[in-house]
């Protein structure tokens, strides 16, 4: 199996992945030769509520990997002996794969580091899909609404679009099997599969139900969206993946063609991605030979610099960056660089604050180890880990847009005291219901408002915040957040 190749190139530089034989346990340790320097491929990642996204970077390493000392060798021998004993002598037959995974998980857990983890072959595949933006499927965005799986929209030119799938189509079966009661991610997994294989969707459109056969293909999800809002160009960057820099460049050129001078780069809830893309993206606005990020391990520091001239069409643009607490990793690298060079003004709320770096090692069986190895700093030397980047101008996110999802396995009623009850109160207030406090107490006044909510949405009126009420509550808050972007609207008004 070949390593996934992470490259960084420009007109006069080309990065190549070279296989290292220094690590006998791994299929290959990723190495990059860039001009006369030797780098290793590393990852900066962040863990948010629902996902882990990583970022590729490059760091100069002077030292060779050292051999094991006597103590290390003794410990390794002990681990090997325990594995052999339990695998062969334990009175119940053991799964050797599970034993080895448990041993690795135990070592990683001992680090007490949320950014270090061991990924199985399947998890590694998803990890790589997230970094590349490529997956095999039909190219249809879906959502769960009213306990139904509904197509939000088929991607332009996708197999789903060519097969006639339309927005608001309800999927009832996948390959003849009902999906009733299944979670959205389970349905997505069923729809995806191997390239050039077929999947049959049973689709309900109005009163009509029919089967649609669709051939799965490799799909690339774009990471950049551009739209014109009055005299302001809004460029939304969802993550930093392969060729995000190219997509950003295209968006900037479109804005220039539209005659726009004021540009908003929306990085809210962008959890990160490839660092070499972040460097290339910064290079669109920052001239050649400037440091974008500093990588530090012990006493060793390496400055990662831009390699091209800035894009001439971007030089006269007034750049604003919009961030929030979900902007992390590569988002912070990019924002920190433009802020340090006074190339952009930062708006919104404080960023996540992720300033450590992970290295990945992939094993022969396709599994992967990710562990923290170093930290990164902005060009001016700011270490933002645990602190985040403070905006130049604060625009607070409405409370309801920052709420955690309430578990639908619990029912809340009068007399209960729980942190989720505060979330219920904030959410109901945002939806127009009268709530006079934001405590964690489920009081009589809240019961009355829950009853009003249930009645308005044709649910069983009990006054208890149960699973059905929770699902509708979450659905309406998501719809409200998608329809009304108060923070972006405030920023555009500031820029007028």
From Swiss-Prot:
One of its GO terms (molecular function) is serine-type peptidase activity. One of its GO terms (cellular component) is plasma membrane. The keyword Repressor does not apply. CDD domains: cpPDZ_CPP-like, Peptidase_S41_CPP. Keywords: Cell membrane, Hydrolase, Membrane, Protease, Serine protease, Transmembrane, Transmembrane helix. The active site is at 329 (charge relay system), 340 (charge relay system), 354 (charge relay system). It comes from the Bacteria. Residues 124-206 form the PDZ domain. Residues 18-27 have a biased composition (Polar residues). GO terms for biological process: proteolysis; signal transduction. It is a single-pass membrane protein. InterPro entries: ClpP/crotonase-like_dom_sf, CtpA/B_N, PDZ, PDZ_6, PDZ_sf, Peptidase_S41A, Peptidoglycan-bd-like, PGBD-like_sf. Its main location: membrane. Residues 1-16 have a biased composition (Basic and acidic residues). NCBIfam families: prc. PANTHER family: CARBOXY-TERMINAL PROCESSING PROTEASE CTPA, TAIL-SPECIFIC PROTEASE. Belongs to the peptidase S41A family. This is Probable CtpA-like serine protease. The lineage of its organism: Bacteria, Bacillati, Bacillota, Bacilli, Bacillales.
């Amino acid at each position: 199996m070949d390593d996934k190749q992470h490259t960084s190139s420009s007109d006069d530089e080309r990065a190549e992945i070279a296989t290292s034989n220094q690590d006998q346990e791994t299929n290959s340790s990723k190495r990059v030769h860039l001009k006369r320097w030797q780098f290793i491929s590393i990852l900066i990642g962040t863990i948010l509520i629902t996902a882990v996204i990583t970022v590729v970077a490059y760091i100069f390493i002077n030292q060779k990997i050292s051999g094991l000392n006597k103590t290390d060798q003794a410990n390794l021998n002990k681990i090997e002996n325990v594995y052999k004993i339990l695998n062969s002598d334990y009175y119940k037959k053991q799964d050797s794969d599970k034993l080895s995974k448990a041993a690795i998980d135990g070592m990683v857990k001992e680090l007490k580091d949320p950014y270090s983890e061991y990924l199985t072959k399947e998890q590694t595949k998803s990890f790589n899909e997230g970094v590349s933006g490529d997956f095999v499927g039909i190219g249809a965005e879906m959502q769960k609404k009213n306990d139904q799986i509904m197509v939000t929209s088929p991607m332009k030119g996708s197999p789903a679009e060519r097969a006639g799938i339309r927005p608001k189509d309800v999927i009832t079966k996948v390959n003849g099997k009902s999906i009733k009661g299944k979670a959205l991610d389970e349905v997505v997994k069923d729809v995806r599969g191997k390239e050039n294989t077929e999947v049959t969707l049973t689709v309900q459109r109005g009163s009509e139900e029919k089967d649609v056969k669709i051939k799965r293909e490799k799909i690339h999800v774009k990471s950049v969206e551009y739209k014109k809002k009055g005299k302001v160009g809004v460029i939304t960057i969802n993550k930093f993946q392969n060729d995000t820099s190219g997509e950003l460049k295209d968006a900037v050129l479109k804005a220039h063609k539209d005659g726009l001078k004021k540009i908003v780069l929306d990085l809210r809830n962008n959890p990160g991605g490839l660092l070499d893309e972040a460097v290339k993206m910064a290079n669109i606005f920052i001239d050649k030979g400037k440091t974008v990020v500093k990588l530090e391990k012990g006493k060793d520091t390496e400055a990662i610099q831009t390699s091209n001239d800035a894009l001439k069409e971007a030089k006269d643009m007034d750049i604003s960056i919009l961030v929030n607490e979900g902007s992390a990793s590569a988002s912070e690298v990019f924002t920190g660089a433009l802020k340090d060079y006074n190339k952009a003004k930062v708006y919104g709320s404080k960023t996540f604050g992720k300033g450590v770096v992970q290295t990945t090692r992939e094993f022969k069986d396709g599994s992967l180890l990710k562990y923290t190895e170093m930290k990164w700093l902005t060009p001016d030397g700011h270490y933002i880990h645990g602190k985040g980047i403070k905006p130049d101008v604060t625009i607070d996110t409405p409370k309801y847009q920052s709420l955690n999802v309430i578990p639908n396995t619990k029912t809340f009623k009068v007399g209960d005291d729980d942190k989720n009850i505060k979330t219920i109160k904030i959410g109901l207030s945002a939806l127009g219901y009268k709530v006079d406090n934001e405590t964690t107490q489920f009081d009589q006044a809240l019961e009355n408002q829950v009853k009003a909510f249930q009645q308005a949405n044709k649910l069983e009126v009990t006054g208890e915040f149960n699973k059905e009420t929770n699902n509708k509550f979450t659905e309406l808050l998501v719809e409200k957040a998608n329809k009304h972007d108060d923070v972006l609207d405030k920023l555009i008004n500031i820029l007028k």
